[in-house]
Curated annotation (Swiss-Prot):
E.C. number(s) listed in UniProt: 3.6.1.9
Biological processes, Gene Ontology terms: nucleotide metabolic process
Disulfide bonds: none
CDD domains: Maf
Residues of the active site: 73 (proton acceptor)
Protein name: Nucleoside triphosphate pyrophosphatase
Phylogenetic classification of the source organism: Bacteria, Pseudomonadati, Pseudomonadota, Alphaproteobacteria, Rickettsiales
Listed NCBIfam families: maf, PRK14366.1
Length: 196
């Protein structure tokens, strides 16, 4: 593991930190950004995702201007409809019923902001297909509480992973941080090549 004191992760997600650690990187600090995550009228899902990742990085960079700041955001969507982070059981049930037996997309955007204000952004869009879920499977998932605060009402890292019949794209991106793209961005500034 390489602890990078000059890197701040702008996130409140323990999963993003764990994903970053998978590529051998430990940020010097983790700061939860306090931002407005409201969707703008007419805003398309990918644009929204990119804006949120950059807004998170910008908000934390305003507090840590001498550091590199890494922000990310994940958005699940069906067509143009953004499936926001779920905070209620009713919302999670609605999302899961809508996603049952269907494909949807998950976009994760990552933004790296340098101390000099240079911004690098990448986005990865993946396709996810849930199996046709029974009422019992949905109820079990809801009772697990794993839906809380998750885009689309699920996290692929938990039991929901057993309900997903296939994905096209990046597993790590669906989980919250596209590792290949993040690694490439960080390699532009930090020597990560010695990490096994």
């Amino acid at each position: 593991m390489l602890k990078i004191e000059g890197l701040v992760l702008a996130s409140s997600s323990k999963y993003r930190l764990a994903l970053l650690e998978q590529i051998g990187v430990v940020p010097g600090e983790v700061v939860s950004p306090n931002i407005d995550e409201s969707l703008l009228k007419g805003e398309l899902p990918r644009r929204y995702c990119m804006r949120m990742a950059r807004t998170k990085a910008d908000a934390v960079a305003a507090l840590r201007s001498d550091k590199f700041v890494l922000g990310a955001d994940t958005v699940a969507y069906c067509g143009k409809r953004v499936l926001s982070k779920t905070e209620s059981e009713d919302c999670a049930v609605r999302y899961l019923e809508m996603l049952s037996g269907r494909r949807h997309r998950v976009c994760t955007s990552v933004c790296l902001r340098s101390p000099g204000g240079i911004v690098h952004e990448r986005s990865v869009v993946s396709v996810v297909k849930f199996k046709s879920m029974s009422k019992g499977e949905i109820e079990y998932y809801i009772s697990s509480g794993q839906w809380r605060g998750k885009a689309g009402g699920y996290g692929i890292q938990g039991f929901a992973g057993a309900l997903i019949s296939w994905i096209q794209g990046s597993y790590s991106s669906i989980a919250g941080l596209p590792l290949h793209e993040t690694y490439c961005l960080l390699c532009g500034y930090f020597d990560l090549k010695h990490i096994p």
